[in-house]
Amino acid sequence: MGAARRFVDAQLRDWGLDDLVDDAALIVSELVTNSIRTGCQTRMLVGVRRPTDRMVRILVGDGSRSMPVMVQARPDATSGRGLAMVHRLTHGRWGVTPLPFGKVVHADLAMPR
């Protein structure tokens, strides 16, 4: 997970998008954690794209066909809040693309105005 966070951090700083680094680090951490929890621990793809000047897209792909599901975590739960945080940080702009070999989860993070 540390390598994924460092990769995203370096790319955003290279693009001069330092204001997005903290939120992006949290997003990539949650997506990678979900990928690991669904059993994909050996092969994972992490990417960052910039589809527009005002948005970055964080991608995490893996070989699991298990789709992520956002759940309502109980107040005393120690897990289950990751996708809800991703949903909040992206204002609902995240999704999953199923592929023959697994899936890619993307999360779109907008530049602050």
Residue ranges of predicted features:
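Short low-complexity stretches enriched in small and charged residues
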Residues: 1-2, 12-17, 60-65, 77
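Conserved short strand/loop->alpha-helix "switch" segment adjacent to the catalytic nucleotide/phosphoryl-transfer site
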Residues: 2-29
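Histidine-centered phosphotransfer motif of kinases
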Residues: 23-41
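Conserved beta-strand-loop-beta-strand hairpin that lines the nucleotide-binding pocket
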Residues: 36-113
